[in-house]
Amino acid sequence: MLEQIRGPADLQHLSTHQLRELAAEIREFLIHKVAATGGHLGPNLGVVELTLALHRVFDSPHDPIIFDTGHQAYVHKMLTGRAHEFESLRKKGGLSGYPSRSESEHDWVESSHASAALSYADGLAKAFELSGHRNRHVVAVVGDGALTGGMCWEALNNIAASGRPVIIVVNDNGRSYAPTIGGVADHLATLRLQPAYEQALQRGRDALRALPLVGKFAYRVMHSVKAGIKDSLSPQLLFTDLGLKYVGPVDGHDERAVEAALRHARGFGRPVIVHVVTRKGMGYAPAEDDEADQMHSCGVIDPVTGQATKVAGPGWTATFSDALIGYARKRRDIVAITAAMPGPTGLTPFGQQFPDRLFDVGIAEQHAMTSAAGLAMGGMHPVVAIYSTFLNRAFDQIMMDVALHRLPVTMVLDRAGITGSDGASHNGMWDLSILGVVPGMRVAAPRDAARLREELGEALDVDDGPTALRFPKGDVGEDIPAIERRGSGLSGVDVLALPASGCNHDVLLIGVGAFAPMALAVARRLADQGIGVTVVDPRWVLPVSDSILELAARHKLVVTCEDNGVNGGVGSAVSAALRRAELDVPCRDVGLPQRFYEHASRGELLADLALTDQDIARRITGWVAALGSGVAEAEIREHLD
């Protein structure tokens, strides 16, 4: 049946039996396609019936359907004519793992950052009203996990006050990555577990209407006290006191029930909450049985067993996890904070060892930072483990709540740099630029597992201001020994390679973090051409160490190589430091051009950006040649462009 679905219109005349068959076929399709490419399997298995109902009740794209976070939009893509493209899911030039405005008019929003859908919906509803399109409904699908984010409640406050026809579908599966936590989750759990009072009321209506003479009068009396009965039976006052109509809870795997609830909500003409209870990983035993995250996201797997087909090597995240536990055993002041991602950020083992010292604050990065500030004020040393891309959400709190007070908060930034297959909104290429403007901030970028452990320990010893460590996604690789260390403490830099005997000190090549191995490969290529290169790992990359300046003074050219946007990164910081020190040494930066990148593998993206060792060596050769010929600075730049 799925092959016959070219768009939402093809769903309108299907029978209940056909819809059930289609739902089963969609699940089978998802399991086999995502098993081959990797992706967000569990969330999509849980929204099959919900997505079918949405596209039968609402007229997309006339009625925008906005999926918060967007990782649960695979079924939406299939029903809007893209099922035939799933072989290319998350591959270069293929189907995005999130909604994509360039793919389809049915996709309105493509950022994968959570808790934003309701604000988009509020703005769209205002725009439709102002432009006279009052017959358009706006639908926002938001998970119970995303409702732990404060932005959702700011939007709910505005939506409720407006009275505009926004339908908010709460996809309640009790989880984000991990089980949802907090007061909102407790309210939703209570609603899920209570008897369905709407069913009880309906039975009462039917019985009263059947009574002779007094039936209609008794029914009216009952209807008049309905609100009081609802208030005593369940805590949906959480929504109704805001001025939002509440419909539910509805079995999210009963397509007809969901459809009826959505049609009911559509008819109100004002803001409505439709509470849909789903099961993440529904219909696939390996996902349903996965206690950790119900296969929220997976790599390539065996579709029968759900087991990974490739065993990953030692990873950066696991290395951090083990190191943090080791330090925490020695120091009771070390605590950890996660924003609803204890598993992906490596904090689950920490929580198992020290359950009273791990705080999951929900999808609330801003609160996480200020709560960490409070913990630090109280004598703790908090470690906030977060994906680099989500650090952006807490900039004001880092600046004004942590740094202004010179508090010892350590931020551990996982998935820094190019992450690849999840696309533009997951690349962690902004953190160095953001943190570089924060007074008193020290940032480390370990090149290997040994340095991660060392630099984490150094960060935990800092008691007069914030620190951050950044590392990429994936395997950590072999340790890279240093020839020597110049300087001490956080100012110490590791020399990884020196010019060959008889070569000049032509280039100081600064390899930042995970780019250190590439810097060494570049140096070998340059040595073959007779160019003398000193390779250093600055370890603590911001602020720029005096040891870097001392080394720079002995070379003809400084080149920085980093997995960050070039604007405001380490290269910018080194150039500024050289100017302040009045060192007349030219500096060139190699990094990521400041733009949004489509999904592809990390290797493919780096190759496209000419960030391979061969490409970088070629560029440096040109720069050295231009300097050696005495060409004016303007001509050098023209040559490099």
Curated annotation (Swiss-Prot):
It is an enzyme of class 2 (transferase). Pathway: Metabolic intermediate biosynthesis; 1-deoxy-D-xylulose 5-phosphate biosynthesis; 1-deoxy-D-xylulose 5-phosphate from D-glyceraldehyde 3-phosphate and pyruvate: step 1/1. It catalyses: D-glyceraldehyde 3-phosphate + pyruvate + H(+) = 1-deoxy-D-xylulose 5-phosphate + CO2. InterPro entries: Dxylulose-5-P_synthase, THDP-binding, Transketo_C/PFOR_II, Transketolase-like_Pyr-bd, Transketolase_BS, Transketolase_C, Transketolase_CS. Thiamine diphosphate binds at H71, S112, H113, A114, G145, A146, N173, Y284, E365. Mg(2+) binds at D144, N173. The keyword NAD does not apply. Keywords: Isoprene biosynthesis, Magnesium, Metal-binding, Thiamine biosynthesis, Thiamine pyrophosphate, Transferase. One of its GO terms (biological process) is 1-deoxy-D-xylulose 5-phosphate biosynthetic process. Binds 1 Mg(2+) ion per subunit. Binds 1 thiamine pyrophosphate per subunit. The keyword Lyase does not apply. Transmembrane segments: none annotated. Its EC number is 2.2.1.7. Its cofactor is Mg(2+); thiamine diphosphate. One of its GO terms (molecular function) is 1-deoxy-D-xylulose-5-phosphate synthase activity. GO terms for cellular component: cytosol. Catalyzes the acyloin condensation reaction between C atoms 2 and 3 of pyruvate and glyceraldehyde 3-phosphate to yield 1-deoxy-D-xylulose-5-phosphate (DXP). Homodimer. Belongs to the transketolase family. DXPS subfamily. NCBIfam families: dxs, PRK05444.2-2. This is 1-deoxy-D-xylulose-5-phosphate synthase. It comes from Mycolicibacterium paratuberculosis (strain ATCC BAA-968 / K-10). The lineage of its organism: Bacteria, Bacillati, Actinomycetota, Actinomycetes, Mycobacteriales.
